[in-house]
Structures are given as structure tokens and as C-alpha cells.
């Protein structure tokens, strides 16, 4: 939906009248001669699920805490990556790296060839296929679950493929550090 200047902070409704987000900003671009900014008609909103999680924390303590596992991956789990890792399909969240002092350091394995400049695709990393029994189709599913359905200090059960074998590991979710 187009958001005009001055609408930031207002609710974004769906056709049923439900609040689905809070308008946050608009995309502006130089659309007129002379470089005068104009509204491109593209708006960005904070999803209601994020607002519902953050606002009570801000009211209570003045800051929001976010969960994290301390892993690296991307939403680009390709067919080539799956084949290189002896998997039938690119389904799940591929763990490319694990932060050495992060929450998942003892439980998950990252790719073994990330330092190899000649490596075409990462190999050897775990693939997370479920968290607490919820299927994970890609890294974005994992990020959303961790951010919106967990709290720092909570244990989560991860179903992983490691070397082609399915197993379960438990990780205590950490609190994402500030990036001041």
C-alpha cells in the first residue's frame, strides 16, 4: 500500500480491518527534474508480529531483547549445494558457519570449506529441517521462528541432517548482542 509523507507510525490494515503492521517509511526517489524527491508509492511497514513482541518489552524495560543461535547461513540453499552435500533436495536451513562462542557452538557444525578460496559451494554444514517439531523449509523460516517464537534462555530442539543422517540436538537460545 502506498504510504504518503506524514503516515509513518500509523497502522496498516488488511481488508478485514485487522492491523497487520505499523507504517514505518516510504521509498523516495528523485522523480522530478532538478532532483526533487518524490513518493514512489512503495511503503514499508513493521509487521504486527514484531510490534506485538517488541512493544511490551520497550514499555517494561526500555529495550528489546532478541533471540539468536549464533549461526550463519543464507536463503540461497541451491540444488548444487544439496548435491554437493549428498542431499536429495535443497530443503531446510543450511548452516554455513557457527560462531565459536555462540549458543549453537557445541551443537551444530558449519561448512568445512568456507576458508577454501577455490570452493564452489559450501560442504559439510548441518541442515536444520525442523525446530521444536515445526518444519523449516529455508533459512528465513528458521530466522522467523527464532525471532518471533523464542526467548533468550529457552531450549529449542533442532532436527538436523548431518552427513546425511537425521539427528536431534538441543540448543539454549542466546540473546543477540548489541551492535553499538
Where does each model-flagged region fall?
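Active-site loop architecture of trypsin-fold serine endopeptidases
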Residues: 1-9, 13-62, 66, 179-180
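C-terminal recognition in membrane/secretory proteostasis and scaffolding
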Residues: 14-19, 53-180
